[in-house]
């Protein structure tokens, strides 16, 4: 079991011995991600390091954020779950950046501004 987060997306990933199925919120992964090749490859990245694509079924519950953020949250959750299964995977995953949580989040809106940084038009007179 591994938890991954990215922006507002939170993914709970469970790895079960199987044949490589990806199930996200009860749907096949390809359907849930609208056959987005980038997102699917991103999720499979940690498995490809150790040639484990066909060894585990991945069952995911994910909510919040958009598809890209959800895919990145799932990727982090998969990497953390692989570390729980075998601790010797940790240094390799860490050196390839799969265990790093992307801390970039939306900057808050400030009072007196239109958005986080966008100011109303300045008039000298």
Curated annotation (Swiss-Prot):
GO terms for biological process: translation. SUPFAM superfamilies: Ribosomal protein S5 domain 2-like (SSF54211). It holds the Pfam family Ribosomal_S9. Its main location: plastid. It is found in: Plastid, Chloroplast. The keyword ATP-binding does not apply. GO terms for molecular function: RNA binding; structural constituent of ribosome. Keywords: Chloroplast, Plastid, Ribonucleoprotein, Ribosomal protein. GO terms for cellular component: chloroplast; small ribosomal subunit. InterPro entries: Ribosomal_Su5_D2-typ_SF, Ribosomal_uS9, Ribosomal_uS9_bac/plastid, Ribosomal_uS9_CS, Ribsml_uS5_D2-typ_fold_subgr. Disulfide bonds: none annotated. NCBIfam families: PRK00132.1 (NF001099). Belongs to the universal ribosomal protein uS9 family. This is Small ribosomal subunit protein uS9c.
């Amino acid at each position: 079991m591994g938890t991954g987060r990215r922006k507002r997306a939170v993914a709970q990933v469970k790895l079960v011995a199987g044949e490589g199925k990806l199930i996200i919120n009860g749907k096949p992964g390809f359907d849930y991600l609208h056959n987005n090749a980038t997102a699917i490859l991103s999720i499979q990245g940690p498995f490809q390091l150790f040639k484990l694509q066909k060894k585990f079924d991945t069952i995911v519950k994910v909510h919040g954020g958009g598809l890209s953020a959800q895919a990145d949250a799932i990727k982090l959750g998969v990497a953390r779950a692989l570390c729980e299964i075998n601790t010797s995977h940790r240094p390799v995953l860490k050196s390839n950046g799969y265990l790093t949580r992307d801390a970039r989040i939306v900057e808050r809106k400030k009072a007196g501004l239109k958005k986080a940084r966008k100011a109303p038009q300045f008039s000298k007179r």
